[in-house]
Amino acid sequence: MPEAGAIRPDATVLGFDVGSRRIGVAVGTALGAGARAVAVINVHANGPDWVALDRVHKEWRPAGLVVGDPLTLDDKDQPARKRAHAFARELRERYALPVVLIDERSSSVEAAQRFARERADGRKRRRDADALDAMAAAVIVERWLSAPEQATLLP
């Protein structure tokens, strides 16, 4: 039985790859075709662009939120992890939805490899940091879709 407040595996979710300048956003559902990149949200000195996040939330109406947890290879804490956890808490407070954290190690590398394949196939024209951030968010959602039991419910 899932933890109280956990996200149903068949639910639509928004996933986030949190960076210091941009947040990649993806949408996914187990009933659909995995996950897809949908937006990149700018982060300013005073935090994320909440107006843009509100628009994405309103458009997709997710049942839960999946935030990449940037663990180091030796499972140590780092500033990026603190930033991701703070963002996850803000999401939970703002949208009153369950928020889970999932290991995002190597998600940017996987996103870059996907981008390179799409470029080689002629589906992408040039390397674009925004596209990579959103694609990394799609990788994060796909990890949750394939193994939701490995996610940690935000305390």
Swiss-Prot record:
Pfam family, one: RuvX
Keywords on record: Cytoplasm, Hydrolase, Nuclease, Ribosome biogenesis
SMART domains from the UniProt entry: YqgFc
Main location: cytoplasm
InterPro entries: RNaseH-like_sf, YqgF, YqgF/RNaseH-like_dom, YqgF/RNaseH-like_dom_sf
Localization per record: Cytoplasm
Enzyme Commission no: 3.1.-.-
GO cellular component, one term: cytosol
GO molecular function, one term: nuclease activity
Class of this enzyme: hydrolase
Biological processes, Gene Ontology terms: rRNA 5'-end processing
Stated role: Could be a nuclease involved in processing of the 5'-end of pre-16S rRNA.
Family note: Belongs to the YqgF nuclease family.
Name this protein carries in UniProt: Putative pre-16S rRNA nuclease
